[in-house]
């Protein structure tokens, strides 16, 4: 299901990720959840799974913006955030200046589910900050291919045009 709460430019668009404060992600996650709550979008979702950063990138940045967006969504929906079931195995280059094809190549096979049995029989909501080509979120969802009886939905804060 594709549902747009509002069509606005992202408040993050003009600032590089490393200069953003994590609290902004949580606030935006709360606002997003409030906008979607009455639509039934969150019904049946068992857990929120933020798109993971590579541990080196997260250490350098100090936080994972998708995790903080997920935390904000969780405050409103009371759906738990689960951050330890998937890892980003490759520290890829930034996607900012890549073509659509290069973005898909850059993220191919970079995620691994570490606890597949935990997700079996669950409906998870993968949360990312910005959807551009969909390459990252599809790569993330594809990592769950071997998990039995899983349902996956995706939520992003912003869609780049």
Task: For every predicted segment, state its role.
Residues 1-47, 54-71, 75-78, 82-123, ...:
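Active-site-facing substrate-recognition patch
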Residues 125, 135-161:
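PRPP-dependent phosphoribosyltransferase catalytic core
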């Amino acid at each position: 299901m594709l549902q747009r709460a509002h069509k606005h430019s992202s408040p993050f668009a003009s600032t590089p990720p490393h200069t953003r404060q994590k609290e902004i992600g949580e606030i935006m996650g709360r606002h997003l959840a409030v906008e979607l709550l009455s639509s039934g979008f969150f019904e049946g979702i068992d857990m929120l799974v933020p798109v993971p950063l590579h541990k080196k990138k997260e250490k350098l940045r100090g936080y994972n913006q998708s995790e903080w967006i997920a935390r904000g969504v969780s405050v409103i929906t009371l759906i738990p955030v689960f951050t330890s079931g998937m890892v980003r195995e490759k520290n890829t280059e930034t996607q900012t200046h890549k073509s659509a094809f290069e973005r898909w190549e850059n993220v191919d096979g970079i995620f691994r589910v570490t606890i597949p049995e935990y997700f079996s029989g669950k409906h998870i909501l993968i949360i990312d900050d910005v959807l551009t080509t969909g390459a990252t979120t599809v790569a993330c969802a594809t990592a769950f291919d071997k998990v039995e009886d899983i349902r996956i939905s995706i939520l992003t804060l912003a869609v780049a045009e």
